[in-house]
């Protein structure tokens, strides 16, 4: 039995550290600008809408809709090749931000654009947890 190679870990930068810390705790957070009310993801040191510095992190409801997706059937990356087929998707959170993620917990052929999904978390090592999504039952 061969072992599945370790999944590549995300690079945790200063502005994104609160996002990854929350993911390790099983929470999905996104940035919110206290000046203009804009939500954004990926984490940045300023609001992309009004340029206010230091947007705050707020907890997301963790649900959204599949905007688009593809089923990966072949991967040149060993850590992902062992997992094919898998779904790579863009998910629009209810708060209005879009994340690139995987859809898990279902047959890849059952995923549909417009499908409701909910955040799930997968620890890939002691320091890194990734945010994935699964269909809402």
Where are these regions (language model features)?
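Short, conserved beta-turn/loop elements at beta-strand boundaries and strand-helix junctions
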Residues: 69-75, 122-126
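Short, basic/aromatic beta-hairpin or loop at an interaction surface
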Residues: 83-99
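Cys/His-rich microdomains that often coordinate metals
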Residues: 37-40, 53-54, 73
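Conserved hydrophobic positions within beta-strands
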Residues: 64-67, 103
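Residues immediately within or flanking Cys/His clusters that coordinate Zn2+
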Residues: 27-30, 44
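Short, cysteine/histidine-rich loop/knuckle motifs that typically chelate Zn2+
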Residues: 32-35, 46-52
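A broadly conserved sequence feature marking short terminus-proximal activation segments
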Residues: 1-28
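Well-ordered alpha/beta subsegment
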Residues: 96, 100-137
């Amino acid at each position: 039995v061969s072992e599945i190679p370790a999944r590549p870990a995300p690079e945790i930068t200063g502005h994104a550290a609160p996002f990854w810390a929350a993911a390790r705790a099983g929470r999905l957070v996104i940035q919110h600008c206290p000046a203009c009310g804009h939500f954004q993801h990926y984490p940045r040191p300023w609001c992309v809408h009004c340029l206010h510095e230091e947007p705050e992190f707020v907890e997301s409801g963790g649900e959204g809709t599949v905007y688009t997706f593809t089923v990966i059937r072949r991967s040149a990356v060993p850590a992902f090749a062992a997992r094919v087929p898998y779904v790579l998707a863009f998910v629009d959170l209810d708060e209005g931000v879009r994340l690139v993620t995987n859809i898990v917990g279902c047959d890849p052929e059952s995923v549909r654009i417009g499908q409701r999904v909910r955040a799930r978390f997968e620890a890939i090592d002691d320091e890194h947890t990734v945010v994935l999504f699964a269909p809402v039952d």
